[in-house]
Structures are given as C-alpha cells and as structure tokens.
UniProtKB/Swiss-Prot annotation:
It comes from Thermofilum pendens (strain DSM 2475 / Hrk 5). The keyword Transmembrane does not apply. Keywords: Cytoplasm, DNA damage, DNA repair, Endonuclease, Hydrolase, Magnesium, Metal-binding, Nuclease. Mg(2+) binds at D43, D109. It holds the Pfam family Endonuclease_5. It comes from the Archaea. Belongs to the endonuclease V family. The keyword Heme does not apply. This is Endonuclease V. One of its GO terms (biological process) is DNA repair. GO terms for cellular component: cytoplasm. GO terms for molecular function: deoxyribonuclease V activity; magnesium ion binding; RNA endonuclease activity, producing 5'-phosphomonoesters; single-stranded RNA binding. Signal peptide: none annotated. The gene is nfi.
Amino acid sequence: MRVHRLPENFSLERARRAQLAIARMVLEEDSLPESVRRAAGVDVAFKGDYAFAAAVVVEYPSFSVVDYSVTRTEVRFPYVPTLLAFREVWPAYTALKRLKSEPDVLLVDGNGRLHPFKAGFACHLGVLVDKPTIGVAKKLLVGEVGSWKSGVAPVLYRGEVLGMAVKTSERSKPVFVSIGHKISLNTAVWIVRMFTKRGLRLPEPLRLAHLYATAYARGNMEEKDFYLDEPS
C-alpha cells in the first residue's frame, strides 16, 4: 500500500479559497418537492488505495430500498482534517451518478455548514450535484451544544447556529445535522427524523449506505453487484 501524499499542485491557501467559494454558493432555503418520499444516503469507506462509496435510495414510509450503487475509485487525496471533502466528494459523486432513480434529497455522512469554514463534505457534494443535501455527522467537529428541547439542541460556533444536535431515540447518542445545500436547518432536522426508524440512531438511507460501503470495502458482497468506476 502506498502512502497518499498531497497533490504536487496543492496549496492550503487554494484549498481554503475553494472552501470559501463553496460556502458562498450554498443555498439555505428549501428547494424540495411538495412530498418528500425518496432519500439517498451517501457514505464512503476506505481500504488501502481505494475509496468505496455507496449511495442507497430509501422510500418513505416503507423504508424499502428502491435503488443503490457502490463504486470503487482510487484514493487521490490524503486524510487532512477540515479538508475531507477533497478526499470524499469524487467517490461519492461516482456512486450518485450510477443511480437509476432520482432521490428528493441527499443524506451525507459528514458535516455541511457545521464546519470551521461553513463548507463541509455535504456542502461540496450538494453544490456539485445541485440537489437538496443534508450533513449528518456522528461526532461533533466544532461548536458547543446548547440547551435541549424535545430531543433537539442548537450547535453554536462563533456565536452562530450552524447545526442541530438531534436525538433520534431516547437511548442513542445524538447526531449532528447541518445544511448541505438547498435546504433549511429546520427542514433538515425534520427529514432526518422522518427517515429514521424507531429506536435507531441513523436515518435509514445513511445507515444502509454505511453498511453497503463497508461491506464492499471488506469484500463481503458479490462481484456481480460491484461497479468499478475509475476517473478518466
């Protein structure tokens, strides 16, 4: 396994400028159909030199899987905190473009606005595909959790509410929900709750995307279901 190094033309200044540009492009208003029925969960797993991205479309209220894809791409960017979008957005995009059905909204494993530069993975992917997108993180990246009310608490960073901590069940740890693109924070929380099965922590599309991506990375799914998609 080779060590993944930063691209030769990389500069932190350019990366930050790109993040700020993405942050300016994010829309924080709802752009959804009247009836939201299909959500795609997006997650990326890594093993060796490859990224395994899964996109799983789940239909509400049955929670049935109506479409999914998993792609394998070569890792082109190392792990750099606050720059995860540069590592994950291409694999995620390749999985999304394989889908045959059109989801109403994307649920992404990672942060959106809840990011030091207001431009996490969910923002990058949402702007790239121009779809309503929600960031759902399992750990708090930045900010402080405020007072809880009805299982929800604001997450403040530098005096601004950038996300919401959401307890999807009484016994589970919270998830941290933030705007990715073309959605309001209140609607994002509502959709996360809507697509979460009773007693579980993660919304079903995202829970399944994590399982699918991990299974492919470990070689636990059939070869005939595997899509190989390398950048040209």
